[in-house]
Design a protein with these regions (language model features):
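Gram-positive cell-envelope targeting signals
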Residues: 1-55
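Collagenous Gly-X-Y triple-helix signature in extracellular proteins
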Residues: 40, 45-332
Length: 332
């Protein structure tokens, strides 16, 4: 019987096709297992499917080891949370809030552009309203001390914080003191203040400003206040012209709620202020608050803003043309 021609070539062809098929199946399996197949099918190609470092989850670190870019991303996630409790859970995951729900001792040094080193700490989580109305800023910080500056060039509190020269200084020179990566990450927020100054009637005068760097108000640090009741009492004194000072206490208590860091540490009205010097690091003496002193006695005090003493004691005032410490707040 004669030999069949071509049978060897057919076998080799079949073997080659089998090898190609197996290799193709292996390639498809590898693409699917690495996520590259879906990218190819969607038209993005293999390069578009490779995860970039920015898309990977952030590692939990000691607070001072986070970069400002990382803290900005953590703050963004806190801000994007559907509610405050979810935001606190994000903060807890990254070590900013403890298991007890209180703000941890999140403090770090900040190298300023003039060579000095400031102390910075977290004082609030989802506490401030973003100025664009999109929700809450993720984190609020306190930084001290940026400078020794007067509140105004002249001795006046007319126009309050909103019209002060120190506010303008913080927006320009103050921001320039900060590291560039920090300054670029700061989110402008809305701050409530008596932006009139001295008030004689019509106490519903608190208004909003948009700020990147700002001074703390009396109520943001010390909570609900009774400073006028403490100084002047609540009952008429015989043979004197009696002034009801209760509206003034309500006014200075309405410039924003107290930040959690201060309430967590027992700061309240005229109590618990001893923790402030340790919280702020090195501060040269007293420091400004943005709250104007709203009462004028024969014109003597229409130039004053509240200040915090080096001991942490509040409720004292200083003429606005005098230099004082600049302890500022900002948000990410």
């Amino acid at each position: 019987m004669g030999k069949k021609k071509g049978s060897g070539a057919g076998a080799y062809l079949l073997l080659a096709l089998s090898v190609v098929f197996v290799a193709a199946c292996g390639a498809v399996f590898w693409l699917a297992s690495t996520g590259r197949l879906s990218s190819l099918l969607s038209g993005h190609g293999v390069e578009g499917s490779v995860e970039s470092p920015a898309s990977e989850d952030l590692a939990v670190k000691t607070f001072s080891d986070y970069s400002w870019d990382e803290l900005s991303e953590i703050a963004r996630r806190i801000s994007a949370a559907p509610d405050d409790q979810s935001g606190l859970e994000v903060a807890r995951r990254f070590g900013i809030v403890g298991d007890d729900g209180e703000i941890s001792d999140c403090v770090r040094a900040v190298q300023l552009s003039d060579g000095r080193v400031a102390t910075c700490r977290v004082v609030g989580v989802r506490a401030d309203d973003l100025a664009d109305g999109s929700g809450k800023a993720g984190l609020t910080f306190m930084i001290s001390s940026l400078a020794q500056r007067p509140m105004n060039d002249a001795a006046t509190n007319v126009g309050g914080w909103g019209s002060s020269s120190l506010r303008s200084w913080l927006e320009a020179e103050g921001m320039a003191l900060l590291p560039s990566d920090l300054a670029a990450s700061i989110k402008p927020v809305s701050k409530l203040t008596n932006n009139s100054g001295v008030v004689t009637d019509g106490f519903d005068i608190v208004s909003s400003t948009t700020d990147n760097l700002w001074l703390f108000s009396a109520s943001e640090v010390f909570g609900g206040l009774s400073w006028f009741a403490h100084e002047f009492g609540t009952k008429p004194i015989p043979n004197t012209v009696y002034t009801d000072f209760a509206p003034y206490d309500r006014l200075i208590s309405s410039e924003g709620p107290q930040y959690a860091y201060f309430s967590d540490h027992g700061v309240a009205d005229l109590c618990g202020y001893e923790v402030l010097p340790g919280a702020l690091g090195q501060v040269d003496g007293n420091w400004w608050m943005r709250t104007p002193y709203p009462v004028s006695f024969v014109g003597i005090d229409e130039s004053c803003f509240y200040q915090v003493m080096a001991s942490g004691y509040p409720s004292t005032v200083l003429s606005s043309d005098q230099e004082n410490g600049v302890v500022a707040g900002f948000c990410l």
